[in-house]
Swiss-Prot record:
One Pfam family of this chain: tRNA-synt_2b
Subunit note: Homodimer.
Keyword Iron-sulfur among record annotations: no
Family recorded in the similarity comment: Belongs to the class-II aminoacyl-tRNA synthetase family. ProS type 2 subfamily.
HAMAP family xref list: Pro_tRNA_synth_type2
Protein name as it appears in the record: Proline--tRNA ligase
Source organism per UniProt: Granulibacter bethesdensis (strain ATCC BAA-1260 / CGDNIH1)
Catalytic activity: tRNA(Pro) + L-proline + ATP = L-prolyl-tRNA(Pro) + AMP + diphosphate
InterPro entries from the UniProt entry: aa-tRNA-synt_IIb (IPR002314), aa-tRNA-synth_II (IPR006195), aa-tRNA-synth_II/BPL/LPL (IPR045864), Anticodon-bd (IPR004154), Anticodon-bd_dom_sf (IPR036621), Pro-tRNA-ligase_IIa (IPR002316), Pro-tRNA-synth_IIa_bac-type (IPR004500), Pro-tRNA_synthetase (IPR050062)
EC numbers: 6.1.1.15
Enzyme class: ligase
One example GO MF annotation: proline-tRNA ligase activity
Domain of life of the organism encoding this protein: Bacteria
Gene that produces this protein: proS
Length: 440
């Protein structure tokens, strides 16, 4: 993408309404534009990040056999009345009527719809277990939307659901999802600590939140320093091995970690003082086991091994995809701007031509741009001062900057800057491209 033609409206000044770093930087870097309170348009660079996160989520869900579906944003109120939640859900649920005066709602969550899908399709224990997920926009009418996409009214969520024959199977599904989430967050370039959490309006009796540590987090968190040493990739665990799942679960839950809602002061203070950690955290994922709460309410049954009808055990598993964009920025930025992990950056590299119109600079910049790939490089071909180009590249947070000036172009060399470390080295074009490729 050539920056001279790109819809990336960077801002020099910080918008007055932006209170936290991610909101400021997303507006300044041209990732989003506010359209109404808590509602944002995602501009091209922001959408690239959103799609990169969603694709990593999809990849890890496929790895555990979860099937992608797409459920409607507008749902029937009758289905929610059947579950008993239509009247119980608060004013954050947007209710509406169609032209025939039928009650509808903009779905804040999807337990009812997914259960309705499966009750019509799955009839026997032989068809279980099942896992399905979607990545879909939701709306919750927050009374005070704030902090940009961190707490907006419209947001993109990954919702996953499991259906199992019995409790043991449901716990196995819960653990498989937890392991897949650890791998997902590792690939997104963040550490997300699973912490005991409240089940909230979804219900259930087993729940973990996945928390990214950040000074602006909405929750106070308490955890064991052992979490600083855990292999977050889960690479040594096989999701299809019950023994590995048990070992993984004990590794994760064997150390104290809780949000303020579930904090056990006595258990925390039983830790050696040197291992006690506190901080602020941002919730980026939440998983629940809630048994037969919805399968009973919606009368979903399957024939068991003995022919008797039974209600499947269910779980619900969410990742805030749009919120993750803001959470990553909160955890990874500096005074100059965003510092994107390589895996979700809108562009792998910025190509900075410091002297537009110079034949050697133009030729080298075009060559580097095309060899990185026009989908993966942002070529700053604007007629701007070098300082403006450097500032915008730092603000937008590209993992690499390839700087091309007259002296270097004459010698066949470029300056390569790593955004995360600030390291600058002068290299041949071949060596610079090799470094960029190795980081992907």
């Amino acid at each position: 993408m050539r920056l001279s033609r790109a819809l990336i409206p960077t801002l020099k000044e910080t918008p007055a309404e932006a209170q936290i770093a991610s909101h400021r930087l997303m507006l300044r870097a041209g990732l989003i534009q506010q359209e109404a309170a808590g509602i944002y348009a995602w501009l091209p660079a922001g959408l690239r990040v959103l799609n990169a996160i969603a694709n990593i989520v999809r990849d890890e869900q496929a790895g555990i056999g979860a099937q992608e579906v797409l459920m409607p944003t507008i749902q029937s109120a009758d289905l929610w009345r059947e579950s008993g939640r239509y009247d119980a859900y608060g004013p954050e649920m947007l209710r509406l009527k169609d032209r025939h005066e039928r009650d509808l709602l903009y779905g804040p969550t999807n337990e009812e719809v997914i259960t309705d899908i499966y009750r019509h399709s799955v009839k026997s224990y032989r068809e279980l277990p099942q896992m399905a997920y979607q990545i879909q926009w939701k709306f919750r009418d927050e009374i005070r939307p704030r902090f940009g996409v961190m707490r907006g009214r419209e947001f993109l969520m990954k919702d996953g659901y499991s259906f199992d024959l019995d409790y043991a199977g449901a716990v196995r599904s819960y653990r498989r999802i937890m392991l897949s989430y650890m791998r997902t967050f590792q690939r997104l370039g963040v550490k997300a600590i699973p912490m005991l959490a409240d089940t909230g309006p979804i219900g259930g009796d087993l729940s973990h939140e996945f928390i990214i540590l950040a000074p602006t987090g909405e929750s106070e968190v308490f955890y064991d320093a052992a979490f600083e040493e855990i292999d977050w990739s889960g690479a040594s665990f096989n999701v299809d091995s019950d023994a590995d799942l048990e070992r993984f679960f004990q590794t994760i839950t064997g150390h104290y970690a809780a949000t303020d809602e579930k904090h056990d002061t006595a258990a925390y203070e039983a830790l050696p003082e040197a291992r006690r950690r506190t901080g602020r955290g941002i919730e980026v994922g939440h998983i629940f086991y809630f048994g037969t709460k919805y399968s009973k309410a919606l009368n979903m049954t399957v024939a068991g091994r003995d022919g008797q009808k039974l209600h499947p055990e269910m779980g619900s598993y969410g990742i805030g995809v749009s919120r993750m964009v803001a959470a990553v920025i909160e955890a990874s930025h500096d005074e100059a701007g965003i510092i994107w992990p390589d895996s979700i950056a809108p562009f792998r590299a910025a190509v900075l031509n410091l002297k537009n119109g110079d034949a050697a600079c133009d030729a080298m910049a075009e060559d580097v741009y095309r060899r990185i790939g026009v989908r993966h490089a942002l070529y700053d071909d604007r007629d701007e001062r070098a300082g403006v180009k450097f500032a915008d590249a730092d603000l937008m947070g590209h993992p690499w900057q390839v700087v091309i000036g007259p002296r270097g172009a004459a010698a066949g060399r470029v300056e390569l800057k790593r955004r995360r470390t600030g390291e600058r080295v002068e290299l041949t074009v071949e060596d610079a491209l090799a470094r960029i490729r190795e980081s992907v």
